[in-house]
Amino acid sequence: PDYLQLARA
């Protein structure tokens, strides 16, 4: 999964 995008949730 995209961790960078998950951190922006």
UniProtKB/Swiss-Prot annotation:
Keywords attached to this entry: Neuropeptide, Secreted
Gene Ontology terms: cellular component: extracellular region
GO-annotated biological processes: neuropeptide signaling pathway
Transmembrane spans: none
Aminoacyl-tRNA synthetase found in the keyword field: no
Principal localisation: secreted
Compartments, as annotated in UniProt: Secreted
Protein role: FMRFamides and FMRFamide-like peptides are neuropeptides.
Family: Belongs to the FARP (FMRF amide related peptide) family.
Protein's name in the database: Extended FMRFamide-2
